[in-house]
Amino acid sequence: MGIKGLTKFLADNAPKSIQQQGIGSLLGKRVAIDASMWIYQFLAAIREGSQWGNLTNSSGESTSHINGMLSRTTRLLEAGIKPVFVFDGAPPEMKKDELTKRDERREKALAELEKAQEIGDEELIKKQSVRTIHVTKKQVEDVKKLLGFLGMPCIDAPSEAEAQCAELCKDGLVYGVVTEDADSLTFGTPIQIKQLNFSESSNKITDKSPSKQKNGMQIIKLSLILSELDINMDQFIDLCILSGCDYCGTIRGIGTSTAYKLLKKYHNIESILKNIDQTKNPIPGNFDFSKVRELFKNPLVSKNNQIKDLIKWSNPKYEELMEWLIKEQNFNEARVNSYCERIKKSKNKTSQTCLDGFFKTASNERKNTHETPSRPPLSEKQKSETRKEVDSSLSCDKKKVKIEETKIISEWGAPVSKNLSSQAEKDLAENSSEAPNQSSEIKVNKIEENKDSESSTVENTPSLQTKSPEPTMRPVKRKLNRLISESDED
């Protein structure tokens, strides 16, 4: 069931949180899929007589869940989507009452179905047939076997699949969670993906408001829900509990809209219960909201460091897949071959599309990196001060270059030019005590290396140039002058 009335409430009161998007927006993204929900949909197709209906094997067992999963998974791969399938584990103890009610409704539906069949009411037969659906362990194992042949990752949740999907999404292992149950948001799913069913309308984007969008893929963002409703996560959980969930009863007379108004006024369930008239709004005996709140905040899940190694896609086992589908499930051989060819093509297409997207993104990043930021024009005073600073720095740099050159030459026992400044000569005298008798007038281009001298070996003698290197500040000056000129033009 999920959360009663939540989707419509969000469409009316937080419309920006629901975005209709095309399936192409999921290209290259990982998504966690509530597999149990999909199996239920495929089994319902039998009763509704849709494309997967009335499919059985030689034993008379329905195979619509296998055919439906094969078809939709193939479409996912063709769309460049990487699915991670998550299956339900043992239900929480608090869900026991809800499961009992479901069993009772199923028994009642079976009785109504028999009556409808007796009178031949086709519409009523379809309606009651859907209500009798129960996913068996055998059907779940069939789907897992199929996905194993396809090389898809499957995860068995210790409890609720929606909670495990939310955990994957919160830790960034998947982009979003594919499910129709709104309680995935209550478990903290940052992004819920609804109606990913590849129907004709699922890839159409309309201008209709979220409340009027019955078809088409929807992206629901939890952060936008909280900001639009102006509540925090704890209050959102309380809103879901008051609206009606699978884990406790509901308070008569309080639906989603009323619950929201009460939360805005009283902030939490504890304060609400103290202020409402419990004669008009009686509290049911199974309304243990504190335990339910804790379940939503800290559900039983496998931590991602325990299961992240399971999220791997492997190459399909085509031969085993074909043998199982054709021989054991009585699938048409030509149809199976067609699926296999589509999967092979989709893998090549997805790889190339992702590669093209990578290079396109990298190219844009390089382009953006080399864009020259706009500079404000310099005032006349700033221009004058800049020129003075450059001239002063350049003058100091010339002296520094000559002195450093002298020090290097003296240190290595090489002759020194007599054109050095007096200050440079003083610095040289202080640092050349080891060679006091060396003449300073020997020309550089007539140096003869002493091969026997340890200080003049090829390895440790620096190369000498007759021309002093250009002072390092000259390029800086040219650049600054160019900037000033550009400013003048502006």
Curated annotation (Swiss-Prot):
What's in the GO CC field?
mitochondrion; nucleolus; nucleoplasm
Gene Ontology MF terms? 5'-3' exonuclease activity; 5'-flap endonuclease activity; DNA binding; magnesium ion binding
Q: Does the keyword Signal apply?
A: no
- State where Mg(2+) 2 binds: 181, 183, 246
Query: Can you say where in the cell this protein is located?
Result: Nucleus, Nucleolus; Nucleus, Nucleoplasm; Mitochondrion
Which SMART domains does the record match to this protein? Answer: 53EXOc, HhH2, XPGI, XPGN
Matching SUPFAM superfamilies: 5' to 3' exonuclease, C-terminal subdomain, PIN domain-like
Q: Where does Mg(2+) 1 bind?
A: 34, 88, 160, 162
Record-given protein name? Flap endonuclease 1
Q: Which organism is it from?
A: Cryptosporidium parvum (strain Iowa II)
Q: What is the lineage of its organism?
A: Eukaryota, Sar, Alveolata, Apicomplexa, Conoidasida
The UniProt gene name for this protein comes to FEN1
